[in-house]
């Protein structure tokens, strides 16, 4: 692939950007980033496609292609101001942009270094692409198996290549709107290249040395691989490459059944693959309350997904296009065959190329960057945020940390990063959403715990939806009845959990929930019903009574 930048006249809005991107896609261009504000487009072309075809495509789309140049690894060095930066950020995801925007608002001079595609994991290869495809999977799943008598629905063949193309367009649009366009909007420097520390206050990028008063490392994480014999010789998939497939595999084996493995496994099950989820643990979602694990497992089995738990992985091998996973389960040896193998066993921090030792930045046993409550590393001038620290790996946590760190590094404040109340959502069907303490965690912290467990078939919204596999669980302090944790398996659980987060964050009690009106026939009503369950038999209550 060769990367090019072309100046374009005639673009006046985001719609124009889409027209240009569509024209370039038709000739085979990849990783297209266009900006009407800058009047340019950056894209990659395979070696066998002449760059003149890009100029022709732009002209035929009724825009005027101007100067075009091949982008080298040194493309931004000329733009670098030799003066010191107030804040130099390594990475360009949610933490990086949150930090940069706030730093600009403080009046700081900001530079951002990115070695790959701007936008980080979430918009490019994580949340956005997976969730839009999950929605497509839900639609085809319902069309094949809807719960209503009298609705004769069916699903045609899935054109995965078209779905992937549509997904890629959405990713490009959001990357431009939420990231690329903001660089000009806030007027900070984007420096393309790989950063490496040379001392405690200097990095080297493309041969140029840059210094700053403060640094933020926000380089994220990438898929990690388990130690399984033969894996290095396999044509395996990761969460990134799976979402680039153009053909649905007949059989897909997933090693790892955390949130990534479950989401992507269920996605391809809905699209038509035979799915086997495999894990070492005896219990699905072992860090969650047992009622949550049981509900999710029941739902997956009902949908026809194969679960292999308590597996000891002996080896993997490939014969032609067939992948085989050899495991021992309950003393018996099994061989799982499939056409594709997805490895989804966690993520590792992107720290290897940073030369952190030169800057005096300490890392943990998994090479994650260690930080204190204020986001500082062992070098007080260098901060870190987001997945690179192996904290809660959510885009909203990264953005929050980036903002707090800028308040401290640039604003001179002493704000602590508070991750005591972090909602988490797994976008399976049904959705899993949790916030606060599990029952076991609450007991470990010394609470005398009282819980309520409400099966989903007691929630009117689930009943009318005819989808009643799931549960609401509330964990409370038995003495004060303050809500300590909320755990949900249901449709739209992710939309309900924000209300639960407020309850946990602000110390609301069970009584606060029961005395607050809840709209009938919403899934959020399940919160109130679960609260009522602490001292009432909700099966003996009329609708909305309490």
Curated annotation (Swiss-Prot):
Residues the entry annotates as binding FAD: 96, 116, 121, 131, 195, 387, 395
Keyword Disulfide bond: yes
Residue sites binding a metal cation per the record: 13, 16
Positions of the HMA domain: 2-66
Enzyme type, top EC level: oxidoreductase
Binding-site residues for NAD(+), renumbered to this chain: 256-263, 346
Temperature-related properties: Optimum temperature is 25-50 degrees Celsius. Activity is inhibited only slightly at 60 degrees Celsius, but at temperatures of 70 degrees Celsius and above, the activity is reduced to about 14% of normal activity.
Entry-linked SUPFAM superfamilies: FAD/NAD(P)-binding domain, FAD/NAD-linked reductases, dimerisation (C-terminal) domain, HMA, heavy metal-associated domain
Regulation: Uses NADPH as the preferred electron donor, but shows slight activity with NADH as well. Inhibited by Cu(2+), Cd(2+), Zn(2+) and Co(2+), with Cu(2+) showing the strongest inhibition. Enzyme activity is enhanced by b-mercaptoethanol and NaCl up to concentrations of 500 uM and 100 mM respectively, followed by inhibition at higher concentrations.
Biotechnology: applications noted: Presents to be a promising candidate for Hg(2+) bioremediation due to higher catalytic efficiency, temperature stability and salt tolerance as compared to MerA enzymes from other mesophiles.
InterPro entries (UniProt xref): FAD/NAD-bd_sf, FAD/NAD-binding_dom, FAD/NAD-linked_Rdtase_dimer_sf, HMA_dom, HMA_dom_sf, Mercury_reductase_MerA, Pyr_nuc-diS_OxRdtase, Pyr_nucl-diS_OxRdtase_dimer
Residues where Hg(2+) binds: 543-544
UniProt entry tagged with the keyword Cell membrane: no
Cited function: Resistance to Hg(2+) in bacteria appears to be governed by a specialized system which includes mercuric reductase. MerA protein is responsible for volatilizing mercury as Hg(0). Catalyzes reduction of Hg(2+) to elemental Hg, which is volatile and can diffuse out of cells passively. Plays a pivotal role in mercury resistance and cell protection.
PANTHER family cross-referenced by the UniProt entry: MERCURIC REDUCTASE (PTHR43014), PYRIDINE NUCLEOTIDE-DISULFIDE OXIDOREDUCTASE RCLA-RELATED (PTHR43014:SF4)
Note: The active site is a redox-active disulfide bond.
Sequence similarity: Belongs to the class-I pyridine nucleotide-disulfide oxidoreductase family.
Name this polypeptide is given: Mercuric reductase
Protein species of origin: Lysinibacillus sphaericus
Lineage: Bacteria, Bacillati, Bacillota, Bacilli, Bacillales
Name of the gene: merA
